[in-house]
């Protein structure tokens, strides 16, 4: 007869050995290794092994505001979230996972950039229709409960930059090249060169209409810059001259239309002078130095206006019409971006203090949600969240490698 208990013991031991061996491959050996390994384990666990797809979170409709309506289904593969995950895995020594995701992307997109969605199902599904389930009362009576996500229909310009950044990182890490990968990259850069002037719904997936978000324009610049870098550093073939010119045009446009000299900071969008925490990405992708006066002004303005109870909010919900009622918690990823910017600006002590404060928000098994409600002193939003764990691992590495932005760590020359 089959000894079920013996088989169960063997399965537990085998599972334990697998995860311990995987964690031991982490190349980070700094002060926060336990927290970094926990974050990397979360990212690995969010990966659907049959395809390599990486979900944003394993849950749906956990509220950003208890009792509110900002409840979303995150059980899908956002290209943005997945590319951030890929890059942090590469930086910590996990190349096979990056190669699997690269191959998943090629299968999922499988066409022109015009048809590229911002998100897919774990097996590459394209139809993710958003449906509300009114018979469910929701977590702590937070309704509606949703399955699917209408953001799948949005145009988000920044995604092209994030995909190009990740594919560049994969090439630099020595992942075996594929002809179809470079063909896709060329199509993406050409698409961005044609469409970077178009408004979009942006990284925060607003439901109030398209705008010329500064973050989106910066990431359009990233898309073209990484295409140029692929030609210059890896000998790929492409229209180098026209791409360099497009890169310069985008950068000039951001400085001319995205910066408010009177206010002393970059703006949320070309037509909206409000602040947005997504602006903190600018020095992290190599667009502008963190100690540039324009960026210093932006960092300080965000600290003044968007840091509430010690944590960074994406924007002022009361001022920035995003098409939704109610409020939300502070955004943990943006708070870690502030850590990165402070460190790059030479404010290491302040950066480290904030990092420790953020890391201490994790629960008893080291998990982080998307947001934190400082008034209720609890995590909110879908859980665990890839964004938050990516940002923790990235910031920990940055604090060990003082003065090196993520872009510079990937061998990119900052601020061309």
Identify the function of each model-found stretch.
Residues 1-416:
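Acidic, mature catalytic/reactive cores of soluble proteins
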């Amino acid at each position: 007869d089959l000894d079920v208990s013996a088989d169960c013991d063997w399965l537990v031991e085998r599972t334990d050995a697998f995860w311990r061996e995987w964690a031991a491959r982490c190349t980070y050996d700094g002060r926060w290794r336990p927290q970094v390994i926990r974050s990397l384990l979360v990212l690995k666990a969010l990966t659907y092994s049959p395809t390599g797809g990486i979900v944003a979170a394993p849950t749906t409709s956990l509220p950003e505001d208890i009792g509110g309506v900002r409840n979303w289904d995150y059980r899908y593969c956002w290209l943005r979230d997945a590319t951030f995950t890929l890059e942090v895995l590469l930086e910590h020594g996990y190349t096979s996972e990056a190669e699997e995701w690269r191959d998943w992307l090629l299968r999922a997109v499988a066409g022109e950039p015009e048809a590229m969605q911002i998100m897919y199902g774990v097996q590459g599904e394209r139809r993710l229709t958003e449906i509300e389930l009114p018979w469910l009362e929701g977590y702590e009576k937070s309704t509606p409960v949703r399955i699917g996500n209408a953001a799948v229909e949005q145009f988000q310009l920044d995604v092209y930059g994030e995909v190009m950044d990740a594919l560049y990182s994969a090439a630099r890490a020595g992942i075996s090249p594929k002809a179809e990968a470079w063909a896709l990259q060329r199509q993406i850069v050409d698409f961005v060169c044609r469409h970077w002037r178009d408004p979009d719904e942006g990284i925060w997936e607003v439901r109030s209409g398209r705008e010329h978000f500064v973050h989106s324009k910066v990431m359009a610049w990233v898309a073209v810059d990484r295409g140029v870098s692929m030609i210059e550093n890896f000998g790929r073939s492409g229209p180098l001259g026209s791409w360099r010119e497009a890169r310069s045009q985008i950068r000039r446009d951001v400085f001319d239309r995205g910066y408010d000299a009177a206010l002393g900071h970059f703006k949320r969008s070309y037509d909206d002078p409000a602040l947005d925490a997504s602006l903190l990405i600018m020095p992290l992708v190599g667009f502008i130095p963190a100690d540039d006066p324009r960026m210093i002004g932006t960092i300080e303005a965000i600290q003044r206006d968007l840091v509430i109870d010690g944590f960074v909010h994406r924007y002022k919900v009361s001022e920035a019409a995003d098409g939704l009622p109610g409020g939300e918690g502070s955004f943990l990823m943006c708070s870690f971006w502030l850590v990165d910017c402070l460190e790059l600006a030479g404010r290491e002590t302040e950066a480290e203090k904030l990092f420790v404060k953020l890391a201490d928000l994790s629960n008893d098994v080291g998990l982080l949600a998307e947001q934190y409600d400082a008034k209720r002193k609890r995590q909110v939003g879908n859980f665990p969240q890839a964004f938050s764990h990516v940002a923790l691992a990235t910031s920990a590495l940055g604090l060990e490698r003082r003065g090196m932005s993520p872009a510079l760590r990937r061998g990119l020359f900052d601020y061309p």
